[in-house]
Amino acid sequence: MSASVAEPPPALSRKAEFKAAKAELLARFKSANHVTPLMHALSRATDDALRSLWQECGLPATLALVAVGGFGRGELSPHSDVDILVLLPDAHASELDERIERFIGMAWDLGLEIGSSVRTVDQCIEEASHDVTVQTSLLEARRIVGSTALFERFMLRYREALDARAFFQAKVLEMRQRHAKFQDTPYSLEPNVKESPGGLRDLQTILWIARAAGFGSSWRELDTRGLITDREARELRRNEGFLKTLRARLHVIAGRRQDILVFDLQTQAAESFGYQPTSAKRASEQLMRRYYWAAKAVTQLATILIQNIEAQLFPATSGVTRVLSPGRFVEKQGMLEIAADDVFERHPDAILEAFLLYEATRGVKGLSARTLRALYNSRDVMNNAWRRDPRNRHTFMQILQQPEGITHAFRLMNQTSVLGRYLLNFRRIVGQMQHDLYHVYTVDQHILMVLRNIRRFAVAEHAHEYPFCSQLIVNFERPWVLYVAALFHDIAKGRGGDHSALGMADARRFCREHGIEGDDAALVVWLVQHHLTMSQVAQKQDTSDPVVIKRFAELVGSERRLTALYLLTVADIRGTSPKVWNTWKGKLLEDLYRATLAVLGGAQPDAHSELKTRQEEALALLRLETVPPDAHRALWDQLDVGYFLRHDAADIAWQTRVLYRHVAADTAIVRARPSPVGDALQVLVYVKDRSDLFAGICAYFDRNGLSVLDARVNTTRHGYALDNFIVTQTEHDVQYRDIANLVEQQLAARLAESAPLPEPSKGRLSRLSRTFPITPRVDLRADERGQYYILSVSANDRPGLLYSIARVLAEHRVGVHAARINTLGERVEDVFMLDGTGLSDNRLQIQVETELLRAIAV
């Protein structure tokens, strides 16, 4: 008896055949990197498969199978949805429904992501009249198989019903709403290649609008129509090709539909384009810069095209409103319009004048398409001679010195690439991503955000946001000096080396070329050099130490420099990420500013005089709260000078009021209150000291989702710990007043236990930290006086990190005197002041450092 091999089921065979054909096309794409042939070939293969299924299901010739959407265009990415319409005649037999369902099911079985609709012609027209999404998908309908007559009747009815003006308005509104979901910027850390501003959807929207208006359905046709130039058409094709290729590569790498350029895939995507890491830039950063440049160009050209199409569909009834610059610029319907197409060629100095007029002229809300196009096509005019022209340098300084509109003008200069062509080093950082785990903007966007933040300090409507900064900038002469410093503080990022030092040289050259002299030039250069210093001192050093304040005051040297650095620092931190700034950091910086200002004003930073002042202020507050006159003495006699220097009068008064009756308490006293500083909880712990106390408190905070911002640890003369913590709960919208009692009860109960310290939890890293891990660093050294040891820790942030550090210190009986927890987005840079007892032993130092590195490792 001979064995026979069973034939595979037809459906299985067809699926395997289709899968093999698709795999061959993808392999060809990987080697040849031509995306258009791939998309067309995938569409043809899908057409063939659907025709075969249609015939197998015995669907009659009176029906039509229609491709719509991207499939209708004949453009399928490797894992795109396949959108189809089964077009029915007005009258059809009910048994057809079963066959249509079978056809759609078999298409799914084939491995296609089918999006299907089954409608008559009348139903299609009715749906399209109510839903612009349906109307859009039908715009590119293409017959695959079935009745040609039915399909042509449908297309005729569709075109008759299509209102080009209404369609334009609906699609532009839809685009604006879509852009708003992405904060109106293409510069997202993880952009959606299809949907983000400047992505493929913007290009498709323009072609849909043009097709609906009868202007053409390709860049070549729009060029022929005069809506774009040859150069613009080439630029659009080039960037469209890049975006399509990037999307296809994302699909191939992920093995599924993947339109978001997530961190996990950025490196692989970059390598697929041939990018290699350098000493200054990761491969992923190079790819992202290419993407941002493409998205920026698409955004700019889309603005021009949409305005041009709008002008054709809605001819203006009024002409020039007023002449703004004779022979150069006019205002037309609220837009700045060039007087002639060759204005910038004949008058290159008019390029910057356009932005000055936009900034200074009330009622002008933007640049017209004609002006934008002329700027776009004047790139060759913006050369070295143009940059050196004294008229342009004067105009640039005028733009910086206007009383309002500066932020908008600089954003527009960047969007049109004029800023990068005037400041060549700025051009180098346009689209430069910063994978440092706390900047969420590209370098150019960060710089403009810092400029915007400084400007907001000076705007009365925003004075409530940062009242102290607004108060300072009102009396700051020539605030444009700060704007120049903002432009240059990070301009040397990505070059390798110290960006502050490199930026100083750029700033010095700019000042020399633009007539900024004397103290103003010196201030600009000094600010660029030291733009990180104030935040480092405030967040990493013991600012209760008079020596620290005196040293910082000597560096600053004057009140004007101090104010300038403070304003730039606040604006800089706020411009990194919405997550990085908090009111606690604001307090640290303001305290440092005020302490330094006092020294610059002649005050001597003397510990004993400061001690006396703090105590007098605290006693005055205690009297207001009706605490008996000498009640404080029992507690204060047990406290050293360091305690009074590290706490302000309000905290001293609060802690004294809580503790003066319980100086020798047998049980832990825990009190919590909403922090007077802002969105945080202040927690006071008073209990007999023990070596694992700090770690135990951190364990409680960790288990309850509370992040420590600051810890001030004190040991009284009679052996009690008097510790003060500032904590936040960032994961949830919490009212700290509501959880204060719970924290008091739970933490007091936890401290009453004698249980050993729990094992630290290895909290999950964020995707950003997993993709861009930083090398953990631990530095342990004696302070300048030899009284304490300073422990500096740098690592990826994760839940449980602080407790992991505290547990290692507790295991080696190393006491924590103070802690500054500095969270910068996805990374931490923490500083601890440790009791020096025992750490003078080099072997113990090495052991502690080794175990800390192991504890904080990813």
From Swiss-Prot:
Domain HD residues, every copy: 443-565
Activity regulation (UniProt): Uridylyltransferase (UTase) activity is inhibited by glutamine, while glutamine activates uridylyl-removing (UR) activity.
Function, as annotated: Modifies, by uridylylation and deuridylylation, the PII regulatory proteins (GlnB and homologs), in response to the nitrogen status of the cell that GlnD senses through the glutamine level. Under low glutamine levels, catalyzes the conversion of the PII proteins and UTP to PII-UMP and PPi, while under higher glutamine levels, GlnD hydrolyzes PII-UMP to PII and UMP (deuridylylation). Thus, controls uridylylation state and activity of the PII proteins, and plays an important role in the regulation of nitrogen assimilation and metabolism.
Organism listed in the record: Burkholderia mallei (strain SAVP1)
Full protein name: Bifunctional uridylyltransferase/uridylyl-removing enzyme
Domain ACT: 682-761, 790-858
Family: Belongs to the GlnD family.
MF (Gene Ontology): [protein-PII] uridylyltransferase activity; phosphoric diester hydrolase activity
E.C. numbers: 2.7.7.59, 3.1.4.-
Keywords: Hydrolase, Magnesium, Multifunctional enzyme, Nucleotidyltransferase, Repeat, Transferase
Any one biological process term the GO annotation gives: regulation of nitrogen utilization
Uridylyl-removing: annotated span: 325-681
